[in-house]
Design a protein with these regions (language model features):
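Structural beta-sheet core signal
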Residues: 35-36, 92, 115, 143-146
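Short, conserved loop/helix-junction motifs that constitute active-site signature segments
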Residues: 106-109, 134-139, 170-171
Length: 220
């Protein structure tokens, strides 16, 4: 059977939805069958696909996307039970909060939680709060993906210290992947088209540890 991968964080602006869509396309381009569920109230990824289809109505779909909008926790539990029986991976774009009534059901069924982050103190504090709650109740393996990192700023001493502090702290909760640089090639992705060479190169080192976990095992 496939795995359930949740893209999640309570801190906005870290690129959760974008990375979720790019990850799904990366898997599809690598020959893996994958489906996506948009569980976020804003439905950003679902609307992104809708816009892409309006501009390219004859394009084939590299992956299907469905939503949980309007679903009760009881309905979501049935959906998750069915998703876990599928022979391929399912990627879920989770709500950016801890109060959505469906989150407990999603998290309890997830094999992997991917948490995009920035190195700043506000993001780190919010992420640590999230991890304390998550690790206390759920068994999914956590991968932190430093995303949208500005290379020039990363060389400044105080930002290097922020980065080192973030990595050291988060290692207590999960795996910190190589970072993804801030780049327009990522934000310009299309949910229908294969990733360009530039896009693949931008994310491949960050995605490799997650894909290895998909291939090797599920929950801890």
């Amino acid at each position: 059977m496939g795995k359930i991968v949740s893209y999640t964080n309570v801190k906005g602006g870290v690129g959760k939805t974008t990375l979720c869509g790019v990850f799904a396309t990366y898997l599809a381009n690598s020959g893996r069958t994958v489906a996506v569920v948009d569980a976020d109230l804003q439905q950003s990824l679902f609307r992104h696909r809708k816009r892409d289809l309006q501009q390219n109505p004859d394009a084939s779909l590299p992956w299907e996307i469905n939503t949980l909008r309007g679903r009760t926790p009881e309905e979501t539990a049935i959906i998750m039970d069915n998703l876990k029986l599928l022979p391929y991976d399912v990627i879920i774009d989770c709500p950016g909060n801890l109060v959505d009534p469906n989150l407990e059901v999603i998290y309890s069924n997830a094999d992997i939680a991917v948490v995009p982050i920035h190195y700043d103190s506000d993001t780190l504090d919010a992420t640590q709060m999230f991890c304390e709650t998550f690790k206390a109740h759920f068994g999914a393996k956590i991968f932190f993906v430093p995303n949208g990192i500005v290379s020039v700023e990363e060389r400044r001493e105080h930002l290097q210290q922020e980065r080192d502090r973030a990595i050291e702290l988060l290692k207590a909760y999960g795996t910190v992947t190589p970072r993804i640089k801030r780049s327009v090639v990522i934000s310009d992705y299309n949910t229908l088209f294969p990733l360009t060479t530039y896009q693949r190169n931008a994310v491949k080192y960050a995605f490799e540890p997650i894909i290895n976990e998909l291939q090797e095992g599920g929950e801890e």
